[in-house]
Amino acid sequence: MKAALVIMAAGMGSRYGGNKQVDGIGPNGEILMEYSIFAALRAGFTKVVFIIKPDMRDLMENMVGHHLAARKTADGENVEVCYAYQDFSSVPDFYTVPSDRVKPFGTVHALLCAREFVHAPFVVINADDYYGVDAFKTIYAELSKLAESGEGTMVGYDLCNTVSEHGTVTRGVCHVNEQGMLDRVGETFHLKPCDDGKIRDIQENGDGPVYAPETPVSMNFW
């Protein structure tokens, strides 16, 4: 089955202080998204779509695009590589973008910018998160089942495996019904493991709501 990996890499990186999507971290200078790409190719994905800012094109091609285009898929075919620009030209006519808006909108805006490059089952991920090899195998298998129905799926993670002792994180807390289906995702902004061993949302204060370690959360892997 042909399937596309759509990578959202147009984030401004303002909290990080630069373009964390293209900072090398591996032994040979690999950037974080390369680990996702290689895991996806091994799982069976055949196409990679980068959603970027226009001024990132040369940087992305030099760091990832050129050698990725030379790689083969699991079936021995060339990997198809595309670049979609996240700008306001894709915003629907019924919405007026504020004149002083510079920063791109979120996930839906990113996907709108990539729609002309996606004509097969696809998944969308963040450029600056690590998802693990097994996650790509799992979601590729699910895509194979869902391809005809047009339905969607998501890879979820236990909250305890996605928080950091070095600061707060934002996670999409998943609310799942008795049938194991996702009802909704609530974005929660200041999750942190506290000194008493409990994970809390400390947005309002240090004694905020407690979340169970196994609470399913979204890392934006749809």
Q: What is each of the regions a protein language model found here?
A:
Residues 87-89, 128, 158, 180:
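Short, flexible active-site-adjacent loop segments at beta-strand->alpha-helix junctions, enriched
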Residues 9-15:
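Conserved adenylation A10 loop of the ANL superfamily
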Residues 18-19:
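Conserved catalytic-core motifs of eukaryotic protein kinase domains, centered on the activation segment
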Residues 133-222:
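Conserved core of the sugar-phosphate nucleotidyltransferase
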Residues 1-4, 13, 27-124, 131-138, ...:
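Conserved N-terminal catalytic core of the sugar/cofactor nucleotidyltransferase
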Residues 6-8, 101, 151:
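Short, flexible coil/turn micro-motifs enriched in small/turn-prone residues
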Residues 8-9, 82-84, 124-126, 154-158:
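Short beta-strand segments
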